């Protein structure tokens, strides 16, 4: 992605997940007050990097003059001015992260949080706060909250009055405390009240097991809940163990995975792919860059990938790469549809700013933003609990097992096909 060292993030979650590039401190402007310097630093980062060169069809320089002339008497007024300036872009992923929020975003990729376990997003079409995905085993998942459910209020506060980070902060809190959410489920007209008890949310991203339930066949199951800093290492370790245990094929579960570190997603794709393109990125100049697999895949055994409406961002990059390269069969429901990349810049006072800098396309140049990825085999999943994942009630998982043991899942396209499956091209 360039000559400078960059750390790839993916947007959360606050949990808002997408693809983020960490770039560190940037020089402040001179000959201004400290508050003006911070505002100008934020303005300049957007001016230099923002994907839309029209800045939502407005004069970005005039906005600079407007906000730098505003009296900025303290840091809170400066943050408010920056947030108002960014809001004129009418794009929810470009946003200010105050120091605590910036720190929390970093923590979510490596540690644990006390909250209800929801990744959230502001729908750019409705401007409504909605659920991207509940974390596996979280209070939110146990309560049955689903992707695209709208969050109308948090403890009685209308979410239309809250920023994304303010909403996230209200849902976090000490363990065993309660928070009330007013939820409008997709396809319904009457909101429901949910009272959830906050718990420590483990961010360990991988669960794996060998499934011997089908006679004569062993299927390795890997569930990846997010692309955190240790995701690649844990997936690689799980894959190595399952290979040693004699797995004949694999199910990679990306359901309700809202994304994570972009580099982790690319590295995990390389575990499965032969030499091939993983993803293209396109910046505001139209310059296209690509990430590729090096041809050193860890296995060439048949692979099925489970996806649903909560599969977003970096998860869609991985799923799209495996589908477009005919390496895997996708099973489940259409994915979320987030195809934008944000760079995360650290500001001079310890705050941060996320700026949408690029969009991505799958290896076959599909732009999935707001469209999602359609699986090869559409299987709708009735509501199940976390404990029922991989059980007979998990019809998507059972469909994946059927594909693997019935002989229609995709194996490494350049290798001999194991007896467990025959290769086919996705429809």
Swiss-Prot record:
Q: Quick one: a GO biological-process term for this protein?
A: signal transduction
Quote the subcellular location field of this record: Cellular thylakoid lumen
Query: Which of UniProt's keywords are assigned here?
Result: Hydrolase, Protease, Serine protease, Signal, Thylakoid
Q: Which residues cross the membrane?
A: none
Signal sequence, start to end: 1-31
**Active-site residues from the entry:** 313 (charge relay system), 324 (charge relay system), 338 (charge relay system)
Concerning Pfam families, the annotation shows: PDZ, Peptidase_S41
Q: What EC designation does it have?
A: 3.4.21.102
What Gene Ontology molecular function terms does this protein carry? endopeptidase activity; serine-type endopeptidase activity
Q: Name one GO cellular component term.
A: plasma membrane-derived thylakoid lumen
Q: What happens when the gene is disrupted?
A: Complete loss of PSII.
**Xref: InterPro entries:** ClpP/crotonase-like_dom_sf, Cterm_S41_CtpA, PDZ, PDZ_sf, Peptidase_S41A, Tail-specific_protease
Which positions fall inside the PDZ domain? 104-186
Provide the reaction this enzyme catalyses.
The enzyme shows specific recognition of a C-terminal tripeptide, Xaa-Yaa-Zaa, in which Xaa is preferably Ala or Leu, Yaa is preferably Ala or Tyr, and Zaa is preferably Ala, but then cleaves at a variable distance from the C-terminus. A typical cleavage is -Ala-Ala-|-Arg-Ala-Ala-Lys-Glu-Asn-Tyr-Ala-Leu-Ala-Ala
Q: What does this protein do?
A: Cleavage of the 16 C-terminal residues from the D1 precursor of photosystem II (PSII). This proteolytic processing is necessary to allow the light-driven assembly of the oxygen-evolving cluster (a tetranuclear manganese), which is responsible for photosynthetic water oxidation.
Which protein family is named in the record?
Answer: Belongs to the peptidase S41A family.
Protein name per UniProt: Carboxyl-terminal-processing protease
Q: Which organism is it from?
A: Synechocystis sp. (strain ATCC 27184 / PCC 6803 / Kazusa)
The protein's gene is named ctpA
């Amino acid at each position: 992605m360039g000559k400078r060292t960059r750390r790839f993030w993916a947007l959360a979650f606050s949990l808002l997940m997408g693809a983020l590039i960490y770039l560190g401190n940037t020089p402040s402007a001179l000959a201004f007050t400290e508050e003006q310097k911070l505002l100008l630093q934020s303005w300049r980062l957007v001016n230099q990097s923002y994907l839309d060169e029209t800045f939502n069809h407005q004069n970005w320089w005039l906005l600079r003059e407007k906000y730098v002339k505003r009296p900025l008497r303290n840091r809170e007024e400066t943050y408010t001015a920056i947030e108002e300036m960014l809001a004129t872009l009418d794009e929810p992923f470009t946003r200010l992260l105050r120091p605590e929020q910036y720190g929390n975003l970093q923590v979510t990729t490596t540690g644990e949080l006390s909250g209800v376990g929801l990744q959230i997003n502001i729908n750019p079409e409705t401007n409504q706060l909605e659920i991207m995905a509940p974390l596996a085993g979280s209070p939110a998942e146990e309560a049955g909250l689903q992707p695209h459910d709208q969050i109308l209020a948090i403890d009685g506060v209308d979410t239309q009055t809250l920023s994304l980070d303010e909403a996230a902060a209200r849902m976090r809190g000490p363990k065993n405390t309660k928070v009330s959410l007013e939820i409008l489920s997709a396809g319904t007209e009457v909101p429901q009240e949910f009272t959830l008890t906050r718990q420590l949310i483990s961010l360990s991203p991988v669960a794996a097991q060998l499934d011997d339930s089908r006679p004569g066949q062993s299927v390795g199951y890997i569930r990846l809940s997010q692309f955190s800093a240790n995701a690649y290492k844990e997936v690689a370790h799980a894959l190595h163990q399952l290979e040693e245990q004699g797995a004949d094929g694999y199910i990679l579960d990306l359901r309700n995975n809202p994304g994570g570190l972009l580099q982790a997603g690319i590295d995990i794709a390389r575990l499965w792919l032969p030499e091939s393109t993983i993803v293209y990125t396109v910046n505001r100049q139209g310059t296209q860059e690509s990430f590729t697999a090096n041809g050193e895949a860890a296995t060439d055994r048949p692979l099925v990938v489970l996806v649903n409406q909560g599969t977003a961002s970096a998860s869609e990059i991985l799923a799209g790469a495996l589908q477009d390269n005919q390496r895997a069969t996708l099973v489940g429901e259409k994915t979320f549809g987030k195809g934008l990349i944000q760079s995360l810049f650290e500001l001079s006072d310890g705050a941060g700013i996320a700026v949408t800098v690029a969009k991505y396309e799958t290896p076959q140049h599909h732009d999935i933003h707001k469209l999602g990825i359609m699986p090869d085999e559409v299987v709708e999943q009735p509501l199940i609990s976390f404990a029922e994942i991989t059980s007979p009630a998990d019809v998507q998982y059972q469909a994946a097992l059927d594909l693997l043991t019935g002989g229609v899942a995709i194996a490494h396209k350049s290798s001999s096909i194991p007896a467990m499956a025959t290769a086919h091209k996705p429809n």
